[in-house]
Amino acid sequence: VRFLLVSKEGDGLGIARRLVDEGHDVVATIKDHRVKGDYDGLINKIPKLDLSIPKETIIFFDSSGGGKTAERLRGQGYSVAFGSVFADQLELDRATALGLMEEAGIQVPPSQHFTDWPSGIQHAEAHQGRLCFKSDNNKITSYVSSGPEDMVEFLRTQEKNGKPADFELQEFVKGLEISTELWFDGYDYARPLNHTFEKKQLMNDDIGPSSGCAGNVVWACMEEQCRVCEEGIKRMVPILRHHQYVGMIDLNSIVNEEGVWGLEFTPRTGYDAFPALLDMLTDELGDLIARYARGDRSPKFPIREKGFGAGIRVTIPPYPFVDVDAPKGIAIRNLVRADRAHSYFYNVFLDDEGQLRSSGAFGAIAVFTSFGDDIFSSIAKCEEIAKRVDLKDRQYRTDLGSVFEKQYREFKDAIQIRPPQDVQPSLSLVG
């Protein structure tokens, strides 16, 4: 099968390489000039989307923002997986996404949208509790304050640095944070769903800057026993069906004694838990993408129903800071053949001598993945690869096994389903 990846920042290049390993003919086009050198020598690339490509090509998108292009390609007769105007709206317009959650009967924390820094600063100064900052269009990393003073300082820093003001300030909700994902075929979702725990801070004990994702663990969700499913993402089904949504969608939520609180959606393949999910698939990835591109009904999601997939991100400085390019040409050695199947690479290339090297850009090298019967064993396998690799100035966390095991115990105590509530979502916001 011939595949074409349309990528914004190269997040889906690991998917493209997986398809090559499965024997498919794959090409990719990348929009962001900073990562144009990623995967040189690993996959074939074209400078821009070529509409003369054969109609039998399966096209897939890895990020938000390309919805109009994806829908235009579908209208021209191409089979396109993922990417839609509705998906863009869900991720890039947080106010609308939160409104849709409320319409679906999902409770959300009080939130306010701002398009200028002074108004946001004034709001934070008047607020007595903790706040969460979330940028529309994903231009600035999310931030959770420890109190009103540091949120004011954070906002003033963004203003001084000339960052675009388009953001939400959301009241902090204490509880256990978890992501729940379903794959939707336009009518219904495939079973089982899956859950993800994620840690963002770069260093052990949640110290240091937020890195987007330092590591995660994924497992299949038995929905009949889970409040997150019943009170959370399953309530979105009528809205997803109304929009004939096709692809994966992830609800990030907080679970506490008051129930499930919806925070945000992630409707794209280039999300941080996808590498770990790959280790749990029981079908080839190419078959899975092709089914959703063709619009086939997909009642069964091909994932192991017992055990845990895991991923640990390995980076080099100045990651996670992107204002300065990471060094280019650092060798990545000591990866044995078996490791390659559990290595989801990012800012790397293969030189003329066959040596894998850093490509510069952001300094994200790879997520090393694994599958195990329990959380400790799955994380331990990831750490074995991370320890073995020879990479100058590598950075990764070493405490995720114990951290995620503790979270999992807390989660099992928190997910018992409450008495059913009759919630019928209105469709006033989905037309």
Stretches found by the model and what they are:
Residues V1-F86:
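ATP-binding N-terminal substructure of ATP-dependent carboxylate-amine bond-forming enzymes
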Residues C229-I249, T266-R340, L350-E353:
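Active-site "cap" helix and flanking loop/linker of ATP-utilizing ligase/carboxylase catalytic domains
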Residues N216-W219, I312-R313, A364-G372:
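Short, well-ordered beta-strand elements within core beta-sheets of diverse protein domains
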Residues Y143-A276:
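Internal nucleotide-binding/catalytic subdomain
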Residues D399-G431:
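A cross-kingdom feature marking charged/low-complexity
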Residues G83-V144, P148-E149:
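A conserved helix-loop-beta module that forms one wall/lid of the active-site cleft
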Residues G162, E384-L400:
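Short arginine-rich
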